[in-house]
Amino acid sequence: MTDRFELVSPYSPAGDQPAAIDKLVANFEAGLAKQTLLGVTGSGKTYTIANVVQQVQKPTLVMAPNKTLAAQLYGEFKSFFPNNAVEYFVSYYDYYQPEAYVPSSDTFIEKDSSINEHIEQMRLSATKTLLSRRDSLVVATVSAIYGLGAPEDYLSLRLILSIGEHIDQRQLIRHLTDLQYTRNEFELTRGAFRVRGEVLDVFPAESDTEALRIELFDGDIEQLTLFDPLTGETLRKLQRYTVYPKTHYATTRERTLSAVDTIKEELKERLEQLYSQNKLVEAQRLAQRTQFDLEMMAEVGFCNGIENYSRHLTGKAPGEPPPTLFDYLPPDALLVIDESHVTIPQIGAMYKGDRSRKETLVEFGFRLPSALDNRPLRFEEWEARSPRSIYVSATPGPYELRESAGEITELVVRPTGLIDPVVEIRPVGTQVDDLMSEVHERIKLGDRVLVTTLTKRMAENLTEYLGEHGIRVRYLHSDIDTVERVEIIRDLRLGKFDVLVGINLLREGLDMPEVSLVAILDADKEGFLRSTGSLIQTIGRAARNLRGKAILYADKMTRSMQAAIDETDRRREKQVEYNLEHGITPKSVARPISDIMEGAREDAAEKKAGKGRSKSRQVAEEPADYRAMGPAEIAGKLKALEQKMYQHAKDLEFEAAAQIRDQIQKLKAASLA
């Protein structure tokens, strides 16, 4: 373990990267608050940021616009910094239905959610790392601006253990229960502890693979040992260990009882208001719901929807922002906003949507007014809490350009020598037939094609039409969840189909080197989906292939089209000059086709494998030759693979399950051959 970032990479900065790294580092060390990295597709933006992190040696928070991109970034930074604390902080809900009331139909919708325990563990690990290590890099989504427990409470509750320290066993057990750990003598699970004589085993909530054994003798801590909770194997002995709370929302008994008193006062004031307005039903509803919650909090220290009382539990004043992940960041940290043209507007939108829903709940007596303070940060609050920042995008928005005040670092030259796609404009009247002939040409070359339309209906019709003409085509739309979307992109890269049709394919920002043609239908319909930024992003999807080409179907040249084409041409010229100067022959990017989400799971899967055991992800590797296996061997292998596939599905690791499913199908085919 080290307190310094150590970048591990087989290659050195090239192209525009050395100058970009030097400029970003110099600006950061000079105290510049905001700067922008304008990096084209395939220019090595992540690698450039990794070099900046290594040089500035500051705790870093990287924000991404969605879980898919966050997982990809987590995997990349994990490979760049294998010896440092790279963490993952996203929403731990697999499914979330917020509490809501629809006055028009008098319908109250109860909160309903499903929490992913593995992601919860990673969130706890992220906050612990930020509080305890300087070499911490956290990849997060917009989840970072939502309320967490106050870091002061989180720190004040922690249990610090040292060898030789005198501690009463009952006191130790009481402290663990204050941290919301549960006693379980039968099975040691995450967030639980067990007592066997003078030995206590604790499975820390933020750990996935290591449990702590506390051995006492006559009231003194004699030994602290980390061990594998699955095998019982001793991993290492320690002089000191800190146990952090099981949840970010843990608080002391005194704070809870104090909150009960202030909630009662607020309830009394609110009921007086409702009675004065003759809102008797609302008053009766609020009194009943709140009094039930108060009884639960007084008796067990918890109630369903306790987050709605967070203002009272944290001691904040009305209207004050809640504590968030940004409160866990040290003041000298570095903030990186990836795909800032998407992430920045997201941050601004979160507060307003949350506010309108909760105002209805308060108005109709389902919640106290203090529930309005359980919210994401407002945009200006987020700005005030943000440390020195770097905005990263191929198409920075007006906010980033304004805030950077001219400090824009360009990353236009690709070390691979790849030039931006050739852009052609063709008439709308024959766009579908022309597209079909282009698709057939690309299929002959073994390449893939992306097609973007303006509407869902048009995408569906085009998919159906292409399918009827024997083209293997799929359609990507907003109703498809993240996991399935990732699988579709993986299948495109694997060649299970050749054409992907969508409405807004630029949002993914994912690497697809097999795509050599991007077709933009109705490119002259000015608007959000055909703005300059959107066009540049979409054209960039073909920038990782040597034969990259973009076709814009349009009958007239719009300002957005002209600006996008001019910018693409400028970048092409700069890359061509660099290639001639350095004698570089462009090559297509060769990126292994793997599970995109594995970045956020691979580390845990490796740890689960434990010392001396094979890595759990190796089940997806294909044996050299199935034909060499006998019938009994094949039957045994099939059974083992099926068990692993179902376990991955149970753990919500759908891409890993899909990989094993493909392997099972190949094994079955081999056994029949």
UniProtKB/Swiss-Prot annotation:
Positions bound to ATP: 39-46
A GO MF term: ATP binding
Calcium as UniProt keyword: no
Residue window of motif Beta-hairpin: 92-115
Keywords tagged on the record: ATP-binding, Cytoplasm, DNA damage, DNA excision, DNA repair, Excision nuclease, Helicase, Hydrolase, Nucleotide-binding, SOS response
Classification lineage: Bacteria, Pseudomonadati, Pseudomonadota, Gammaproteobacteria, Lysobacterales
PANTHER family: UVRABC SYSTEM PROTEIN B
Subunit structure of this chain's protein: Forms a heterotetramer with UvrA during the search for lesions. Interacts with UvrC in an incision complex.
CDD domains with a match to the protein in the record: DEXHc_UvrB (cd17916), SF2_C_UvrB (cd18790)
Protein name per Swiss-Prot or TrEMBL: UvrABC system protein B
Region (Disordered): 601-628
Organism (species): Xanthomonas campestris pv. campestris (strain B100)
Annotated GO CC locations: cytoplasm; excinuclease repair complex
Domain called Helicase C-terminal: residue spans: 431-597
